[in-house]
Amino acid sequence: MCIIAIKKAGVRFPDITTVETMCDSNPDGFALVYHDTQDGKARTYRTMDREQFLRHYKSVLRSHDFRTTNLFLHARIATHGSLRRENCHGFVDKKCHLSFAHNGILYSIPNRGDLTDSETFFRDYFIPVFRHGGWFEADRLIRDVIGYSKFVFMDNKGNIRHYGDYIKDADGMLYSNSSFRRHPYSYYLKG
């Protein structure tokens, strides 16, 4: 059902082992959305390749200061839509300067071809409401559809808004579920 990890400025980056665990538990596509403090813009990186994703994440760790960097990661388990890069979260609307990821299933959003329920919500519901009424109206829409899901948005200035109940670890990281933890029995599952 996917996982979102949110790191706000001042919180240390999640370690590589944690990110690897997220990817192993949710292997159907990966995204990293971060505020690039060097040029002041939000960047979105999406891939189907776990190793490419981890390499890109490590390069962000080396080139960005945890004290000033906001980011979120998303690892996908496909429930709607096929396994392809375009269905990886970190959906972007360039006119609104927003990136979006979702964890859960949006039961009230109808299937639209090969799109995920997340992309359908973002593109066909959220963006029109946001363009019309800003965050005030968008918050109302989110409350109406979120259920047990989790959402995260980042604007082009690196501001993060998140919705739903997240797990907060001792370091201040937020996770949408526990699939970032290596479970004690996982050793036996690797055949």
What function would you assign to each model-found segment?
Residues 107-168:
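Short histidine
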Residues 2-6, 29-37, 73, 89-92, ...:
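Short beta-strand scaffold segments in enzyme catalytic cores
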Residues 52, 64-65, 69, 73-75, ...:
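Regulatory input/activation interfaces that engage signals or partners
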Residues 1-57, 71, 166-191:
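Extreme N-terminus nucleophile/cap motif
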Residues 97-111:
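Conserved beta-strand-loop-short alpha-helix elements that form
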Residues 14, 43, 80-83, 109-111, ...:
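Short helix/loop capping segments that flank catalytic or ligand/cofactor-binding pockets
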Residues 26-30, 66, 71-73, 84, ...:
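Short, basic and Ser/Thr-rich N-terminal targeting/leader segments
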Residues 79-99, 141:
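Acidic loop->beta-strand submotif enriched in PP2C/PPM serine/threonine phosphatases
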